[in-house]
Amino acid sequence: MDRRTLRMKTLLLGATGQIGNAFAEQLPSHWDIISLGKKELDLRNADNIPSTVFKFEPELIINCAAFTEVDLAEKKKNECSAINHIAVHELAKTSKALGARLVHFSTDYVFDGCQALAYSEQSPTGPLSHYGQTKLDGENSISDTGCEFLIFRTSWVFAKNGKNFIGKIDKLLRDRDEISVVNDQFGAPTSASFIAKIVLLSLLRSNLSNGIYHLSSAGATSWLGLAQKYLALCLNESAENRQYKCRKIIGIPSSEYQTA
């Protein structure tokens, strides 16, 4: 039977985040949807996951919850591991027990960034940060359980809500005459709305088997290139009467970037 005719019982986790909010806006209205944010299910405490998930008996679990602040992850390693690895493993085990399918989101930070060409799903992983390592650990823990799963590795996610590079840059562009942005890291800026749209199309068409898939927009740029493009677009949108002080963006290497 076509999934579009079913009342798919779906548990959406991380519903208030960037990707979660995009799913909340796009999930089919005829599906039976339960949306949980951090207040309803805090993934820092994995012991609560089985009882909470079993209570709803979902057929599909979409996990959009994650610890995503790369720099902060180095200072909060236990919390990052708890959310990105331990909780994900518990979700996968619970999905297996329920016979539910788990949709999970990972990142291009599972790679070391040294490859000149675009990474494929078969490319060797080699995370350089604690954040990247926890996301890779989460991937492996899902596949190890034998549950039904789809893992999507995304890149430089942005949305109108939530914490992301665009939001941070917007504030800096308003407040400062000149800013410095890293120019030697490259990725594919990808909107949360696009991610939700493609994943839902795949679910509705039932055309993906268990596995890991790369999902991002076409092309690539640096953080510097993205900041410059954003400023140019904002300066052209005079109708919104935005006030930006910044007129100069300087490119710097990652080695000169100072974290807060």
Where are these predicted regions, by residue range?
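NAD(P)H-binding glycine-rich loop region in Rossmannoid oxidoreductase-like domains
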Residues: 46-85
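Active-site helix of classical SDR
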Residues: 134
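Mid/C-terminal beta-alpha module of Rossmann-like enzyme folds, strongest
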Residues: 175, 198, 205-259
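Active-site "gating" loop of Rossmann-like NAD(P)-dependent oxidoreductase/epimerase domains
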Residues: 67-70, 75, 108-128
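N-terminal Rossmann NAD(P)H-binding glycine-rich loop of SDR-like oxidoreductase domains
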Residues: 8-28
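NAD(P)-dependent short-chain dehydrogenase/reductase
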Residues: 140-187, 193-201
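NAD(P)-cofactor binding segment of oxidoreductase domains
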Residues: 75-103
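Adenosine-cofactor binding site in Rossmann-like domains, unifying the SAM/SAH pocket
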Residues: 30-51
